[in-house]
């Protein structure tokens, strides 16, 4: 309940015309605590509902920033803005390339054709994700501070892999080096994924998903046996182009890009491997990319 409370608090502080109470009933099918942005969905939905109800002309980007502020200042998680941004600016059958430093963004079509996005749920709630997110953020900031003694940069995202390889030795802790390596290499993979989608090169896109998961596992260390089993067993299924964990890690979900004729094979093979390894079954959702938050009249 703190997510709507946070949005309501900040809206009331900013807009004095919100003078009356209201009843809100939430209905949805996003699993809670599954790294599918349920909290950001509640934040943006609540904000959109209240601003519509009270005829407040609030810029969509400001609402997105307010959602992040709820996470940072009301909930106490030092999270980024990606979840709120995609829910605020999502476009049907498109991905978004977002620079979180400048908030500059570009849409790119996701014309997967006969390939579908499958979400694989570990059915294990995230218990460490929020504290570990803050820990990883702090580790990246420590690595950046050491690199800044030799490079004129404001963020790890400004550093190329070639620069990192030349200056990695200045980071005096091996763990911090791996954290920085993940952030920098993931930034490069994201740009490559954007170009692959533009070129309809889904084989390369799938390979980037696989490489991303490997980096999240080995360098950033935010996966765990459940997510690794899902992603790695999915990667072996014929008809799967790629798979990786999604969200904050440690539990929650992974995604796979799979040929529509191989979806049942994916479910069967992954379920068998996951149940044998973890002891219980995962869940699967097959989804399409939809528009962001909107009123029912806009659907």
What spans do the regions from the language model cover?
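Short, flexible active-site loop motifs that bind/organize anionic cofactors or intermediates
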Residues: 33, 53, 195, 217, ...
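Gly/Ser-rich oxyanion-binding loop with an adjacent helix/lid
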Residues: 1-110, 262-263
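C-terminal nucleotide
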Residues: 94-242, 257-299
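Glycine/serine-rich anion-binding loops at beta->alpha junctions
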Residues: 29-44, 239-257
């Amino acid at each position: 309940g703190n997510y709507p409370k946070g949005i309501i608090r900040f809206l009331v502080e900013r807009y004095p015309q919100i003078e009356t109470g209201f009843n809100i009933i939430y209905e949805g099918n996003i699993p809670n605590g599954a790294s599918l942005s349920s909290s950001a969905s509640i934040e943006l939905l609540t904000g959109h509902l209240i601003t519509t109800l009270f005829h407040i002309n609030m810029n969509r980007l400001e609402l997105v920033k307010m959602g992040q502020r709820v996470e940072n200042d009301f909930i106490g998680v030092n999270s980024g803005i990606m979840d709120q941004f995609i829910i605020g600016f999502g476009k049907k059958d498109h991905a978004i390339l977002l620079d979180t430093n400048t908030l500059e963004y570009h849409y790119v079509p996701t014309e997967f054709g006969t390939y579908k996005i499958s979400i694989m749920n570990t059915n294990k709630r995230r218990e460490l994700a929020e504290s570990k997110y803050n820990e990883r953020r702090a580790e990246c900031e420590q690595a950046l501070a050491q690199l800044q003694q030799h490079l004129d940069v404001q963020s790890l995202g400004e550093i190329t892999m070639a620069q990192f390889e030349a200056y990695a030795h200045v980071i005096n802790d091996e763990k911090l080096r791996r954290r920085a390596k993940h952030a920098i290499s993931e930034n490069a993979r994201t740009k490559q994924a954007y170009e692959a989608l533009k070129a309809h090169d889904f084989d390369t896109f799938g390979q980037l998903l696989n490489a991303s998961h490997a980096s999240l596992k080995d360098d950033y260390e935010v996966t765990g046996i459940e997510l690794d089993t899902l992603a790695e067993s999915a990667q072996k299924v014929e008809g799967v182009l790629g798979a990786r964990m999604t969200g904050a890690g440690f539990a929650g979900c992974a995604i796979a890009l799979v040929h529509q004729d191989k979806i049942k094979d994916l479910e069967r093979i992954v379920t068998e491997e996951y149940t044998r390894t973890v002891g219980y079954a995962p869940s699967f959702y097959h989804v399409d990319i939809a528009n962001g938050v909107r009123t029912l009249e806009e659907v």
